[in-house]
Amino acid sequence: MAKDKIHPIVVQALENEQWTITNDPLYVEYDTDESAFEIDLGAEKLIAAEKGNQRIAVEIKTFAGSISNQFHSALGQYLDYKAALSNSEDDHDRKLYIALPEEAYNKLNSIRFFRQRIQQYELKFIVVDLESQKIVKWIE
């Protein structure tokens, strides 16, 4: 699977926030190899002791080109990956996020149809400032 152009920037942004990349890509098998997925990143971060370990999986998207086509593709992948993760012995506890540039998130958020789908499917985002290579928002 080809890595998006912003892949190294997202990796750096996560590392800047003390995330340790554990799998790049994260391989999740559902039933067989035919239904296996590669998710761009697996990362885990130790949170305060009372919260335990927080584990995430991150799909990286640039949202270049048609925003409608890119959203449709990202939504389909997100739903498939979420189902695969929930059935995985090793990775069922990972929270799934879509990492995307701040500009792309702002554009999605400005269109009512996309806002409604984001709420409907409870999408989670990591919004990244590409210039500073920093995470500007975690959308839960």
Regions found by a protein language model. Name each.
Residues A2-V11, W19:
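Nuclease catalytic cores
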Residues T20-A57, Q70:
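Active-site metal-binding core of divalent-cation-utilizing nuclease and nuclease-like domains
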Residues R55-A57, G65, N109, F113:
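Basic, low-complexity intrinsically disordered segments
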Residues I60-F71:
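Short beta-strand-loop-alpha-helix junction that forms the active-site gateway
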Residues N69-A83:
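An N-terminal amphipathic alpha-helical segment
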Residues A83-Q119, V128-L130:
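Nucleic-acid nuclease catalytic cores
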Residues Q120, K124-E140:
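Charged phosphate-binding loop/patch that engages nucleotide di/tri-phosphates or the phosphate backbone
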